[in-house]
Amino acid sequence: MTQPDREQILRGVERYCHAVHTQRAEDFQPLWAEGTQNGLLSPAGCFSGTEEIYRDFLVGRIGAAYARIDLIAESVEVRPVTEDAAVALFRYATDCIRRDTGEPYGIAGLETQLWVRQGGEWRLCHVHDSKQ
């Protein structure tokens, strides 16, 4: 894996954090691979396919629970799996405002993201996060 590959994946993780904050489809959906069975596992459940991940997880769960959310990725490591696949591992924390009470809230945990190369670009294929 080249340094430009690593840097592109690191930028992808930053873009993912930004997309969680904005919750806009135009920020979130282009991050994901096309023609693959994308998935997301979290304490909130298991979600399959980019549209379901966006609609049911990001908007339906995260957006419904928090008036504001900042996802903070810390100590991101990129590990190659094959020439066209890599894993990003990191600790995360959230800084949120609960929609129901207006109170600050946050969680922390570990996240694993699987990235695949498509057309020379690194795209997200799978996310697994766990709360600590």
PLM segments and residue spans:
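A solvent-exposed, acidic/Ser-Thr-rich amphipathic alpha-helical stretch
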Residues: 4-8, 25-84, 90-91, 105-106
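Amphipathic alpha-helical repeat scaffolds
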Residues: 10-18
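Short helix-adjacent coil turns
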Residues: 16, 23-26
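Beta-strand elements of well-folded, non-transmembrane domains
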Residues: 21, 94-98, 115
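Short beta-strand segments enriched in hydrophobic/aromatic residues
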Residues: 32-33, 92-94, 128-131
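Hydrophobic alpha-helical segments of small multi-pass membrane proteins
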Residues: 76, 94, 110-114
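A short, structured loop/turn motif at beta-sheet edges
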Residues: 78-87, 102, 115-123
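Short beta-strand edge/turn micro-motifs at domain boundaries
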Residues: 106-132
